[in-house]
Structure formats: C-alpha cells, structure tokens
Amino acid sequence: MDQVKIGRFIADRRKTAKLTQLQLAEKLGITDKAISKWERGLTMPDTSIMLELCDILGISVNELLSGEKISMEHNDQKNEQLLLDMAKE
C-alpha cells in the first residue's frame, strides 16, 4: 500500500466533502493532528475507524486502501491485488 497516495486521496475526499481536518477529526473522535499525519502519508487510519471514515468520505474500504476511486468493472481486480499486497506486508 502506498501511504502517500492514500493520504492524498483522503485529503481530496475530505475537501470534496467540504470538511476541514478539524471537522473530520471531530466526527471521528480523534485529533486533527492524526488527520494531518494521514494526509501527509506518515501514518494510516486505525482499522477501528476505517469504516466510519469511509462512510463520511463516501468511499469504500477498497478505495481507501488503494488510494483511488474504483469503478465497478475493476473492483474484483483491485480486491485481489489489495489482498495480495496485504499478504506481503
């Protein structure tokens, strides 16, 4: 997984949702510093809040972990690649 790409994607989706880092952090019950670290690719969101984060940003977990919007026709291929990447880590 490319943390920098994922971070940029989170930032893009947050801005599309017209949320500041602080507003997103408040919705998730975390600090805006955590959001900043995600968006700079320094850390990843904790698995315990990924579903809520995805719901707020209007994306799937697969899209979050791939760092891009996924069309339905490429969904199965992306799922398989994500599983392979996770197995390597």
Residue ranges and their predicted role:
Residues 14, 25, 54:
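The alpha-helix within a helix-turn-helix
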Residues 11, 22, 51:
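Residues within the helices of the helix-turn-helix
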Residues 48-63:
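DNA major-groove recognition helix of helix-turn-helix/homeodomain DNA-binding modules
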Residues 67-89:
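Short, charged recognition helix plus adjacent turn
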Residues 18-37:
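Short alpha-helical DNA-recognition segment
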Residues 1-16:
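A short, Lys/Arg-rich alpha-helix, primarily the initiator
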